[in-house]
Each structure stands twice: as C-alpha cells, then as structure tokens.
Design a protein with these regions (language model features):
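Structural preference for beta-strand elements that scaffold enzyme active sites
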Residues: 2-4, 29-33, 53-59, 119-123, ...
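C-terminal domain-boundary segment and adjacent tail
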Residues: 210-245
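Active-site gating loops and adjacent loop-to-helix segments of metal-dependent hydrolytic enzymes
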Residues: 66-94, 211
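Boundary/entry segment of secreted carbohydrate-active catalytic domains
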Residues: 1-14
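A short alpha/beta connector and helix-capping loop motif
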Residues: 14-39
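Acidic (Asp/Glu)-rich catalytic clusters
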Residues: 20-26, 44-55, 73-80, 114, ...
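Catalytic domains of cell-wall/extracellular-matrix polysaccharide-remodeling enzymes
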Residues: 98, 106-171, 181-187
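Active-site beta-loop-alpha junctions enriched in small/polar residues
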Residues: 8-10, 35-37, 59-63, 125-127, ...
C-alpha cells in the first residue's frame, strides 16, 4: 500500500508553515495544500521554493477569510468575508452564483501559480467538495491536476485521485493508533490512501483565526516521530505525494 500524508492549511499562519515544513523534513508529510488568501501566504511561497521536494497543491476555500476577488455578493457577508464554515455555505447554497465560485477559485489558483509554484492537486478548506464539485472538477481538468477523493463524490472521470481518503487523524482521532488501524485496513493492497493532516506550531495568528489549534502540535509530534516511520517501514508502506499518482 501507499500513503499520502497531505498537510492542509499551508500558509494559515507562520507556525503552520514551519510545522508543515518540519513534518516534511523530519517526518512523513510529502504533500501540502496552500491557502491563497492566507496570512502567511508569502512565507509559505518562500518556504516552498526553498524546498522543491515538498509537493504543493491548492487548498481552495469559500469559508475562510476574504476572497481574492471583490464584488462576490453571493459568497460573502456584509463585511466582505466568506461564510465561516460548511454549514453556513450549504444553508445559502441556493443563492450562490456558481459563476462567482468559478471566478474566485480560478483567482486563488492563479495567485499560487503567479507566485512561481507548480500545483499538483486541489482539495478544499472545510471539505466543501460536495457543494462545489462540478466547478472543482472542471478546474481540475483545466489545470491538469489531481483531486482529493471525497466520499460524497462518485464520478471523478479521468482525473487522478487516491483510492481512499481518511479523515480519522483529526481532533480526538489524532494518535499513532489511528494510523496503525488505517494501515492494517489496507495492508497487502496496491491502494493509495490519503491521510488528512494539519501539523503546526501554535502561534498568535493560529490562535486568533482557527478553532482547530491544540491538536495540531500533537499531529506534528506523531508525524515526525521515529516510531511512526519505523512502523511504516516494517509494514512496507510506501510514502508518496500527489505528484506520484
């Protein structure tokens, strides 16, 4: 079996950038997805360029911060910010202009490309794939990239995805045992499993803008542990990135 440990939220704070970098240099993370509208975007770009082996994707968002574009009336609140989470976006979905979705997501992708980075894959912040999948699929075809496999989406066409996507390593599920259980579920197969991760060092920015904070340091500890790397080696698990699909 093969595993992609993808680190979401690259750029959300300096601590997240450096936590993901350390999880790449000393751990099992080989892929990460960058928020184009994130506070530490420029730092993330700099770090990515200094570490070309770190596979970069776009962490497309309609539920975090402010959009790249202005005038997106169906996607933003009175303050010009995106709705705060999946539920808020879903509840107003009937009024969302999918043309605005396409333009904003394209702007996010183009910002990353304009910074000089190559993009291998797309995923979304707060797992909004089921709400915007037709647009995301179209953009994946346009840019020739892979996608995260979402349980609520069945038709990926010719777009490459992992065989399975695991969200188990999150919040109360952040443990070495969680990863061991996932490995035992797929050991002996040729399947590619993506495990979602969010490693980070806690900083003031992260404390201010994210509700998911403390578990990120535990994720970082596990993902950089010699125990995990030794176990994966013993089980003959190959660690790959989205570039390898």
């Amino acid at each position: 079996m093969k595993i992609i440990f993808n680190a979401d939220d690259f750029g959300i704070s300096p601590g997240a950038v450096y936590g993901i970098l350390d999880s790449y240099k000393r751990g099992v993370v080989k892929s990460t997805t960058l928020l184009a509208n994130s506070p530490a975007f420029d730092l993330a770009v700099e770090v990515a360029k200094e570490n070309p082996g770190l596979d970069i994707g776009a962490h497309l968002t309609l539920t975090f911060g402010r959009p790249i574009l202005q005038g997106l009336e169906t996607l933003t609140d009175n303050d010009g910010c995106f709705r705060k989470n999946y539920t808020a976006l879903e509840s107003g979905l009937a009024d969302v202009d999918m043309g605005e979705v396409e333009r904003e997501l394209t702007a996010q992708i183009e910002k990353i490309l304009a910074a000089g980075l190559m993009i291998s894959h797309f995923d979304t912040h707060h797992s909004i794939e089921p709400l915007i999948y037709p647009v995301q699929h179209m953009l994946a075809e346009k840019y020739g990239v892979s996608l995260r496999r979402h349980a609520d989406v069945s038709d990926f066409g010719t777009i490459k995805t992992p065989d399975f996507f695991a969200t188990d390593f999150y919040a109360d599920g952040v443990s070495f045992e969680t990863i061991k259980k996932l490995v035992q579920s797929y050991i002996g197969t040729n399947d590619v499993i993506e495990i979602m991760t969010h490693p980070a060092f806690i900083d003031d920015t992260l404390l201010r803008i994210s509700s998911y904070v403390q578990p990120r340091t535990k994720e970082h500890t596990i993902l950089t542990s010699g125990e995990l790397q030794a176990y994966l080696g013993q089980q003959e698990v190959e660690i790959i990135s989205f570039r390898d699909l």
